[in-house]
Amino acid sequence: AVGDTTAFKDAVEASNAVLIDVRETGEYEEGHMEGAVNIPLRTLGENLDKIPADTPVFVYCKSGWRAGLATSSLRMLGYDNVLAYPPGWNGWTEAGEPVSTEAATGETYEVPEIAPEMYTAVNDFLTTIPEGWLSAGDTEKVAAAIEAGSAVLDVRTPPEYADGFIPTAVNTPLREIPTFIDVIPTDTQVIEYCKSGWRASLAIPIYHVLGFDNVLGYSGSYLAWTDAGEPIETP
């Protein structure tokens, strides 16, 4: 991910990257980055021929959340060339960057070989994303859900977790999620979080492809939780 707008612009220009806007078509038509091709998040799996596998690709959405879902999904399909711009359209426009309303058609690319089981799992995840984009809501909603019995997972690194975590949270570091499947509940709602929400958005597709469709993400994550003065625990 490239979170700084100037660094993002430099990276796109230097690499002649392909820009993918994964917002809904109506959002895209109201304004987008010049040259960005619109592939709404839920349709990514059906439009892989619009995404190159061998040149840099940057994905963005409105706030960064959908871009994380898209980046993680595409990487599971073998697109290691995909990065994201987490500030999204909000960050781009707040920085006073130019807005285009001219639709970009993009090119057609050869789709790489993907294991059929993985393609099916990822595409099933993408096409069934509900309204709300699998977000657990704001801090108030998350606190109420935890109070009501939702399980909590922390996808940050062990040192971050050791410095303090949301009460009852179990640490399942992002890069090691598949090794923790035995500790992920299947019979209750699960809310996962990180520090800022970015890693949480990357984690959602991983949990769901592993079969845990009861997992939602807390987009505000630990920063929003502590900013709200909510309690924390330490090991």
Kindly give the residue locations of the regions a language model identified.
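Rhodanese-like catalytic fold shared by cysteine-dependent sulfurtransferases
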Residues: A1-V18, T25-P56, W65-A151, P158-I191, ...
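Active-site neighborhood of phospho(di)ester-bond hydrolases with catalytic His/Asp-centered motifs
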Residues: C61
